[in-house]
Structures are given as C-alpha cells and as structure tokens.
Amino acid sequence: MSFEQTIKMPEDRIGVIIGKNGHVKEDIEQKCNVEIDIDSESGDVQVSSQASRLDKMEPFKAIEIISAISKGFSPERAYRLLKEDLLDLLDIRDYAGKSSNSIQRIKGRIIGKAGNTRKTIEDLTGASISVYGHTVGFIGSFEEIRIAREAIKMISKGSSHKNVYNMLQAARRRAKFEKMQLWEHEGPQPSNRTDF
C-alpha cells in the first residue's frame, strides 16, 4: 500500500518548489522520505510515499510544506513545519468582499511600508506570515498563530496599527508573565537526599 496526493500549485510558485537545480524538491524529498513529481504545465505536484512512512507523518509534512510554499512562504520558512509548528490560512475576502481594490488596500495595510507591519507582527508573535493572493498564511505554534491571526483580523477590519501593536505588546507581556508564574510554581525541586 502506498500514499499518493496531488496538490495544485500556482504557476508562479512552481519554480520555487523546484528550486535552483532542483535543490528544494530534492530537499523536501530527503527530509520527508517522499517522491515528488511536478507537472510544470498543469501546476500539479504529486507527493507519493510507501505505506511504512505513513506512521511517521512524513508525507503529510511534505504536503504541508508544499502547501505553505504555494501560499507564498519561502522554503526555509516552510521547513518550520517539520517541527511541531502549524500552518493556518486566513482569506482576506472575508473582510474585503470580492472587490480587488479592497483586497489590495487590506494587503497593503497588512504588509505596511517596506514590509514593516508584517515584520513587526512576526517579531511580536514569533509566527511567520506570508501575504499572497487573497490569503494570509501563518506558520508557528498554536499560540503564536492565534495572536498573529487576531492582529491580522484587526487590521483587516480597519483598526489602527497603533491599537494592533498595543494588543500584541499586551499579549506578549501576558505570555511572559504566565511563563514566569509557571516557573515559580514549579520552582526548584526538593532534594530526596538524606546523606547530609
């Protein structure tokens, strides 16, 4: 028994999944123990693996990595998915409707001047963010994605960048405080030694 799944890639992302001299494709194949066949004309990317690999989730990780690359992430950022990180997508059309002008305006607000808004959200949450087409992609832990997604929703609904940054900084302080409390509650463990 074997595993096989086909993913449709946008035409302008085919070159990224192949990589220079085929290195990205080979890298994904090696890291995930899969075979990848790419049809450059149709945009179909077929991932296949032997059944023995399914218990390690490797083929599914390959599909997640390819999906992330198709949504605008660089291969290096997509490789975060090999760890415990997750991929999540948000459709800008939920906030802009189908108007291409509204979609472009919201994308511009999310990216910011010279990419500063996106970079600030990434820095304050730890999530990687990609804006491609009408979607915003997130890679990170559940909590990183939750906070970054909330920031993007606020921007998409028209909140000022200042309010979004304030929310992000408050969330960051709260997370640090919770981490400190966890450390205090665990604290150093008493020694069981009796030979003092």
Identify the function of each model-found stretch:
Residues 1-196:
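RNA-contacting regions in translation and RNA-metabolism proteins
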